[in-house]
Amino acid sequence: MNKQASQPRAIYYVVALQIWEYFSFYGMRALLILYLTNQLKYDDNHAYELFSAYCSLVYVTPILGGYLADKVLGNRMAVMLGAFLMAIGHLVLGASEIAPTFLYLSLAIIVCGYGLFKSNISCLLGELYQPEDPRRDGGFSLLYAAGNIGSIVAPIACGYVQEEYSWAMGFALAAIGMLAGLVIFLCGNRHFTHTTGVNKAVLCARNYLLPNWGWLLILLVAAPLLITVLFWKEWSVYALIVATAISLVVLAKIYRQAQTAKQRKELGLIVTLTLFSMLFWAFAQQGGSSISLYIDRFVNRDILGYSVPTAMFQSVNAFAVMLCGVVLAWLVKESVSGNRTVRIWGKFALGLGLMSAGFCILTLSARWSAAYGHSSMPLMVLGLAVMGFAELFIDPVAMSQITRIDIPGVTGVLTGIYMLLSGAIANYLAGVIADQTSQSAFDASGAVNYAINAYVDVFEQITWGALACVGVVLLIWLYQSFKFKSRALAVES
């Protein structure tokens, strides 16, 4: 085997942890909107609001998580601490079936754990490569695709356990998965000795009467309580506004920190990619909310007398990501010629185009439901699979570019900002979009027809919105291609 072409051994432990984190996070996510509407009897508006608030805040905390990793914890310790908190949160969520007051607290604990984990797992992977290592893109595609093994199995396993036993057991299974991933990761600890560890000097330094480790403990207790209040009072939108304002200030600081035109150009590319990623995910995140309730209410899920649990459909998207991601990871080493910026915009155009095609298929499904009362399952599966394939041309490309930037000490923060816009703001926008399909009652036939037509309208609008984004990205791609060819001709002459 060519050792230069093979991936670092440490990547397999990172991938294993990612698999189980996906299992934990997406197993719970597949159940959450259904739990709120079917078990806790929230109306659609309330369920969408809480679901989008949760999905938004899990992407706000990576900014703080990235900062703590860069300055104090290091990526490895931040990832381990985040995994532990997420497992605790899922266990508490299971108890909310008995005591609903635990609902907000459990979601808050998961949000804090996710903040420490999500941005720093990618940065930890980035530490395994040199900046221009040709294996880097393949490693990120492998991480993204292999992680989806967990998100394929999770909706099936958690959905089945919930259906056969209870909601609490479904959430507990998600917690067990996260703990299993943490144990596996700890077994490979010796392969990460060259990565950044805990900054003991900063951790032990005193600030305002207490050492920093004391302030860190206070933060770990206070943050979940504060986020619980945000859920309870429905103040999450204000948190997003504050986080966005802080991020703009941080971006301006990083821009001033850039010392060369090349660094400023790289930062500008990352910001532009982030904005298009935000729009992409505002569309894609319908999968856990409006699409999930659409499947639950208007898709014929019967196979030979067995009704497929709605949560299991979340596996379709993940299966498409994994299958196509493995192929892309193999092909990427054959596609390293030409200008990198041109390739990036070409991939983004393809990803947004596939998202538009996926929602076009869902629009056909919704029209079928409007005509016949229920849509066919194969059409739904096809649409979800196309949307899953689209993901491979967005996040791995953007994350790889962020970890490549040549400005010291900013990758964690930039990753957190990327998560804020493409995750938090995108999920808030996704909630606004999903709310257009809300219906509190489906008893009268008129209400049912109205609900189906609402899904038709929303899915069709997303189709055209994604297509418009493709047009803009293609213009950028053509401009970059022309500029690259002009420079090549100038060099030859």
From Swiss-Prot:
Organism: Salmonella paratyphi C (strain RKS4594)
InterPro entries: AA/pep_transptr_DtpD (IPR023777), Dipep/tripep_permease (IPR005279), MFS_dom (IPR020846), MFS_trans_sf (IPR036259), MFS_Transporters (IPR050171), POT_fam (IPR000109), PTR2_symporter_CS (IPR018456)
The name this protein goes by in its record: Dipeptide permease D
SUPFAM superfamilies recorded: MFS general substrate transporter
Gene Ontology cellular component annotations, sorted alphabetically: plasma membrane
Residues that span the membrane, as ranges: 14-34, 49-69, 91-111, 138-158, 167-187, 212-232, 235-255, 267-287, 312-332, 344-364, 379-399, 413-433, 458-478
PROSITE patterns tied to this protein: MFS (PS50850), PTR2_1 (PS01022), PTR2_2 (PS01023)
Described purpose of this protein according to its UniProt entry: Probable proton-dependent permease that transports dipeptides.
Membrane disposition: Multi-pass membrane protein
Biological process terms in GO annotation: protein transport
UniProt similarity note: Belongs to the major facilitator superfamily. Proton-dependent oligopeptide transporter (POT/PTR) (TC 2.A.17) family. DtpD subfamily.
MF terms (GO), sorted A to Z: dipeptide transmembrane transporter activity; peptide:proton symporter activity
Coiled-coil boundaries: none
Organism superkingdom: Bacteria
Keywords: Cell inner membrane, Cell membrane, Membrane, Peptide transport, Protein transport, Transmembrane, Transmembrane helix, Transport
Lineage of the species this protein comes from: Bacteria, Pseudomonadati, Pseudomonadota, Gammaproteobacteria, Enterobacterales
Compartments reported by the entry: Cell inner membrane
